[in-house]
């Protein structure tokens, strides 16, 4: 009779765990996306009202892009388990971050004689005319 009570207990507990999972995980996700879309709508309305206020100025004849095409993708409902990662508006060029000045550093560090330089000519740190330390003096 012990085995029968365990199976009866398991049949009662498993649906309760599934119900708790639904309330804790599945229900908050659409609520979060609805909150994000309402914030996006509010920002869009603020931008459109600012654009309407600026249209009274003399620069009203300039053609401005419609905000509706930018807002369409942002207001789509996407069900995910995490927050959206903000992406920068301007892409970062990785080539600019890399330092590829090997030729310049070699030219600065060594003089024509292959000796390591400690300073430029005419500076206060100058050791002699060639820019390298002479160990004989």
From Swiss-Prot:
Q: Where is the signal peptide?
A: 1-31
Entry's Gene Ontology cellular component terms: extracellular region
Spell out the subcellular localization from the entry.
Secreted
> What GO molecular function annotations does the UniProt record carry, in alphabetical order?
neuropeptide hormone activity; neuropeptide receptor binding
Q: Which family does it belong to?
A: Belongs to the gastrin/cholecystokinin family.
Stated role: Drosulfakinin-0 (DSK 0) plays diverse biological roles including regulating gut muscle contraction in adults but not in larvae.
Its protein name is Drosulfakinins
């Amino acid at each position: 009779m012990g085995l029968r009570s365990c199976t009866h207990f398991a049949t009662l507990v498993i649906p309760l765990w599934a119900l708790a999972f639904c309330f804790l995980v599945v229900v908050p996700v659409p609520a979060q996306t609805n909150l994000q879309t309402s914030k996006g709508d509010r920002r869009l309305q603020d931008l459109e009202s600012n654009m309407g206020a600026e249209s009274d100025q003399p620069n009203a004849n300039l053609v401005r892009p419609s905000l509706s095409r930018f807002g369409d993708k942002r207001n789509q409902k996407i069900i995910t388990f995490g927050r959206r990662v903000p992406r920068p508006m301007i892409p970062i060029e990785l080539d600019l971050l890399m330092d590829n000045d090997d030729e310049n550093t070699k030219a600065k560090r060594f003089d024509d004689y292959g000796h390591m330089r400690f300073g430029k000519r005419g500076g206060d740190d100058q050791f002699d005319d060639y820019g390298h330390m002479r160990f004989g003096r």
